[in-house]
């Protein structure tokens, strides 16, 4: 395996890379860096998490060190990805005087104009805000020699294809080296390559997200009215460390987030209407384990690079294979195992088959957890919490109440009653989600058929998960047991069973 120095990287940059823990280049870095240093156009097909930022960022640092003015422009689909790329570039170039500026919407443009006037060597931005600066002439292109399009297919999916053309057309082709990276190569991206790139070197890497055996993929068949309860039952049984939940619409994300919070789960939501300050706050909470469930739309989650995600739940099935690929690619990274579960209405099974055919592998059918499994998981969780609570000092007033109760009731019955209330507390909470119509069946041409997706004049009614619960699941179970007042010693406490987890593959 070649090291970075053997690829032609300077000692200063190698030192920065080693301080970041990067000793050897990843496959895409090894294949891309030599051509990038020569100024050759590069067309890279790679997923997030393969080291593609280093593939274009490391040679870029080598080309701009010691020079002044904007020399490189990097386009990214989202604000989060733009910030992540910029931060990595700053780390790559530590101590070498390279200035990196980010420009994106949701932040004051005046502050960005001020930063651009200082003549940074590298600008990273989203297409819309970059065009704003081009039109204002606050971003000059005459000195730009390198243009990089990161996650080009995502920018296309978000409707930026014309913006990408506009920006590429503004940078003089004679002096421009173009590097385009994309997980997939749809026709629109291929046309962009043909129009604006000069005999690019094509580099492909192993499709980490689609072929990674570390991701176990499942689907579970569930009707819309039963979906939320089935989902929370999976959460109770799986006990995810960090989970990303995908909803199809902003409304779905808002309602699902509120419903989860009301049930006691640590969740936050992300979608396109969330302010930049709120987005940063939510992501910080997720990365710092203050919350463990992130509910998001496809657009809001694009460009996020969060490690440690153990589970991905497609609460709403994605409408195309590419979205599915990007969704499940948030888990199973860095050699860790991941689980992806897709909830599918019976009439949406054509979409599951389409995804399986495109990816060349089958998903495993996963039955919803039984009530017994859910209760066992909740009991295990409560036992662990109680053990943690016992290590903390209780307030004196609570000790007084405890003494009074223990004097009045049998201790085992008292603890059992309290545990039952804790375990079944979620069943008492009512939540409402707007009914979402399932996707249309696929026709013979692979496109939706019939009129299932036509807008109903009556709108989308709301359903109450308490009254419309899954068959066999009670929404409200109150204990009818009356515990006896204490007359005799209980003879000691009853031993609890050890912690067991239901097998998600049963």
Swiss-Prot record:
GO terms for biological process: response to cold; RNA catabolic process. SMART domains: DEXDc, HELICc. It comes from the Bacteria. One of its GO terms (cellular component) is ribosome. A motif (Q motif) lies at residues 2-30. Its main location: cytoplasm. InterPro entries: DEAD/DEAH_box_helicase_dom, DEAD_box_RNA_helicases, DEAD_helicase_CshA, Helicase_ATP-bd, Helicase_C-like, P-loop_NTPase, RNA-helicase_DEAD-box_CS, RNA_helicase_DEAD_Q_motif. The keyword Hydrolase applies. ATP binds at residues 46-53. Residues 468-480 have a biased composition (Basic residues). Residues 33-203 form the Helicase ATP-binding domain. It is an enzyme of class 3 (hydrolase). CDD domains: DEADc, SF2_C_DEAD. It catalyses: ATP + H2O = ADP + phosphate + H(+). HAMAP family: DEAD_helicase_CshA. Oligomerizes, may be a member of the RNA degradosome. Belongs to the DEAD box helicase family. CshA subfamily. This is DEAD-box ATP-dependent RNA helicase CshA. The lineage of its organism: Bacteria, Bacillati, Bacillota, Bacilli, Bacillales.
């Amino acid at each position: 395996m070649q090291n970075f120095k053997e690829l032609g990287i300077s000692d200063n940059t190698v030192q920065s890379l080693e301080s970041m823990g990067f000793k050897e280049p990843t496959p895409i870095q090894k294949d891309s860096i030599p051509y990038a240093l020569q100024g050759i156009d590069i067309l890279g097909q790679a997923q997030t998490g393969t080291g593609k930022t280093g593939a274009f960022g490391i040679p870029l640092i080598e080309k701009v060190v010691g020079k002044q003015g904007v020399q490189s422009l990097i386009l990214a689909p989202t604000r989060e990805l733009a910030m992540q790329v910029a931060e990595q570039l700053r780390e790559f170039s530590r101590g070498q005087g390279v200035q990196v500026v980010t420009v994106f919407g949701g932040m004051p443009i005046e502050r960005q104009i001020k930063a651009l006037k200082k003549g940074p060597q590298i600008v990273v931005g989203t297409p819309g805000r970059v065009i704003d600066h081009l039109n204002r002439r606050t971003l000059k292109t005459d000195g730009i020699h390198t243009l990089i399009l990161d996650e080009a297919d995502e920018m296309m999916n978000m409707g930026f294809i014309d913006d990408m053309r506009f920006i590429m057309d503004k940078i003089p082709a004679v002096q421009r080296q173009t590097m385009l990276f994309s997980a997939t190569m749809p026709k629109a991206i291929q046309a962009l390559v043909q129009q604006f790139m000069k005999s690019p070197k094509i580099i492909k890497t192993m499709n980490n997200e689609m072929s990674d055996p570390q991701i176990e993929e499942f689907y579970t068949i569930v009707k819309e009215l039963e979906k939320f309860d089935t989902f929370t039952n999976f959460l109770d049984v799986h006990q995810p460390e960090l989970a990303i939940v995908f909803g199809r619409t902003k409304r779905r994300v808002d309602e699902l987030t509120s419903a989860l919070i009301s049930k006691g789960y640590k969740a936050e939501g992300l979608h396109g209407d969330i302010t930049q300050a709120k987005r940063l706050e939510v992501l910080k909470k997720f990365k710092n384990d203050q919350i463990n469930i992130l509910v998001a739309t496809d657009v809001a989650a694009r460009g996020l690079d969060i490690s440690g995600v153990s589970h991905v739940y497609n609460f709403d099935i994605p409408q195309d294979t590419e979205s599915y690929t990007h969704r499940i690619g948030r888990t199973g990274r860095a050699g860790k195992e991941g689980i992806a579960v897709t909830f599918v209405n019976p009439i949406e099974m054509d979409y599951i088959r389409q995804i399986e055919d495109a990816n060349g592998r089958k998903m495993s059918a996963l039955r919803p957890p039984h009530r017994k499994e859910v209760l066992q998981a909740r009991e295990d969780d409560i036992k662990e919490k109680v053990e943690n609570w016992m290590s903390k000092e209780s307030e004196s007033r609570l000790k007084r109440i405890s003494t009074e109760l223990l004097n009045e009731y049998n201790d085992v019955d008292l603890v059992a009653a309290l545990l039952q209330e804790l375990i079944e507390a979620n069943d008492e909470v009512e939540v409402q989600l707007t009914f979402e119509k399932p996707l249309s069946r696929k026709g013979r041409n692979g496109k939706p058929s019939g009129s299932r997706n036509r807008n109903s004049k009556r709108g989308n009614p709301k359903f109450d998960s308490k009254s419309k619960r899954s068959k066999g699941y009670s929404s409200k179970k109150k204990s009818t047991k009356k515990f006896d007042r204490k007359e005799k010693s209980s003879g000691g406490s009853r031993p609890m069973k050890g912690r067991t987890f239901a097998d998600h593959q049963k």
